[in-house]
Amino acid sequence: MRFTHQKCGGFTGAKGEVKLMTLDPGHFHAALVQKTMYAQVSPTVYVYAPKGPDVEEHLKRIEGYNTRKDNPTSWQEKVYIGDDFLQKMLKDRPGNVVILSGNNRKKTEYIKACAQAGLNVFSDKPMCIDAKGNKLLQEAFDLAAKNGVIIYDYMTERFEITTILQKELVNDKELFGRQQKGSLEDPAVVKESVHHFFKYVSGNPLKRPGWYFDTTQQGEGVVDVTTHLVDMAMWECFPQEPIVYQKDVKIKKAKRWPTMITLDEYKKVTGLEDFPSFLKEKLDDKGVLPCYSNGEIIYTLKGICAKASVRWDFQAPEGAGDTHYSVIKGSKANVFIRQGKEQNYKPELYVEPPAGIREDEMADALKKAIAGLQSKYPGVGIESNGQGWHVLIPDKYRIGHEAHFGQVTQNYLKYLADGKLPAWDVPNMKAKYSTTTAALELARKQER
């Protein structure tokens, strides 16, 4: 199968040529794209949305960026509010790039409508949350190719320094050796994360929309955050290689389970006084909401056994936060990311010998690998910790999750100016969403 670059016309990288249209914003990620200004992007942004708290919260966040003391932005939001917001945007077309981050049940329909209309799409993940949505998304990618526009999702974790360096080290064959195959009981690639419903964003308590806890609108955990985890497995282990779902991916096991949300917790994070009717029908006998935000997938990727797992708690303990754990296993080295209490809830990178390999056998190859990184990442170092090595990462590379939205936006702007995505990116987006949605189908089937 031959993959070609997707062409996109009309952009040169000129100042202000990209005109954003934000459609039905309902998640704070829509605003994070605008936390900084971009020379290529016009300061005038067109917002189309139904009346309600979602768009109001979005506009407050943009206003917060415009009025902050340090490096304020200067966005000018032109807002249309009405039930016909989608039709109105498609008719007016004041911009050329649509920003999508909100209710995931509607998102895939928006993506397809935009692709059909010849509009570029820059979307938060997930771009679909079930098998029906995945079918629409696959059709949308085909329409985008036909109409010469680019659909792209925010894969912010590709800009996290520990992930970047993990990728560099596992692709250093002198250090890492061969990628291990693993097994269902002991996968060779593991990506796990823990998240929290109540958290702080840009220094303020995050207010989530009432529908966020309805998995038919937000999506279950196995199709939401796992999008990042599945993406990282492909991006790190098979860089710049197209993944074809039907040929390269086999779902072996999948499961889902709920986080129980009390009314007091729901009030705290949404600001609403009661569960809405669409959630009341899902409450248990004690009036508690089972929210299926947790999931696990065990699958093979080009013959390598991988596991992606996500868990949501309501709120992190004092001083704690979201966590991530990852390991990629090679014949000569295992490369870990750990982000727990021992790491002060900050992601840290480790290189450790697998069984049968002595620490001193790895030392020269690791030192050589770290020396080779100095041109791109000066200051990165290592220290022995008794189990292997801790990779020392200067603070200048730890810019934080919110800043990654600016980086992924810059990447997208470059692709627009280039007129194409990398040849592997669309096949891999197609494979990624086919993986997560098929896993959800299997998890539900296995419960019956």
Predicted regions and their residues:
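Short helix/strand-capping hinge loops at secondary-structure junctions
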Residues: 118, 124-126
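C-terminal helical cap and adjacent loop that interface with cofactors, partners, or active-site loops
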Residues: 224, 229, 233-234, 241-246, ...
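Short mixed-charge
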Residues: 66-88, 177-191, 244-250
